[in-house]
Amino acid sequence: MVAAVTVGLLLTACGSGPLPSNLAAKEGHQVEHASSASPSASESLPQTPLRAGEHFVELKTPADYRPTPKAGSTDDYRCFLLDPGLTEPELVSGVNIIPGNPNIVHHVIVSQVPASQVARAQALDAADAGDGWTCFGGTGIGGVGGRNLDKSDWVGAWAPGGGERVMSEDVGIPLEAGTQVVVQMHFNTLTGGGADTSLVRLRLSPAAGSAKKALNTMLLPAPVELPCRLGHTESPLCDRAAAIDDVKTRFGETVATADLLHVLCGGDPIGDTQQCTRSVREPMVIRAAAGHMHLLGRSITIDVDKGTPQAKRILDVPVYDFDDQGSRALS
């Protein structure tokens, strides 16, 4: 049995009424996953010029971090705490994440850490040898998605096919003074090796006096526990409990994510197709949607009000391409 997670995400702004203008996307297929190209973090894609009141803050992960998967694994999930030096509240209006070594970078998630939780993050860093700390499934600071799944602590994310995301001028992600960020890197050394230094470029503007609506990321995880293939059912990891224990051994997971997903989503824990239905508890406008799976993924959809006259499919990926995971702006 292979235990994994499928994640859909929505960029949402609270409020009702007509759908505002989309996030302005500046996305391109930056580098194919596991390709032979290895651009440095300084080799950015062309960026959208700064708009009135905006400025850039650039953050880099520790220089030349070399992933060190545990024996029997090719995955290293590592979190790094970085300080953007915010002395006043700011709004994030764009994110550009540039992997330094895309041969080994599977995905990147940037999460905010409010000032009240920075000491917790620093303690996790200090308790783990070397740069950063092991963080499978989340940062380890505030649970999966930080605050909660409906309004997560995500600031931005990158997976193969993603690029710079510049938001519509009427929205922004709030960051309070003293906020720091955690950059979670998922490294996979199956088809490559070497070191990595990645870059996160935040597009910021002052929050004071701004009329922008707060933008949040809603996480839509679903369980993916694939049955072992015919002819391979004798593996010890075809036992669900053994597979989950293996994940905890390799990545130090302290939260039973797999079991929590089944409480959230219900259904048979093992199957080729999985789904999860979530309730929306307040008015919101969906600005963009994205789906993330691993290489065994075949298709992914996100439906709103399924089975009702108002039903609408907001994400439809009939043939999933691991190298094309950029978010889709909605109209």
Model-derived features: positions:
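Sec-dependent N-terminal signal peptides
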Residues: 1-7
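C-terminal motif of bacterial Sec signal peptides marking the signal peptidase cleavage site
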Residues: 10-13
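Bacterial signal peptide processing site
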Residues: 15-18
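Beta-strand-centric surfaces of beta-sandwich/beta-rich domains
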Residues: 27-331
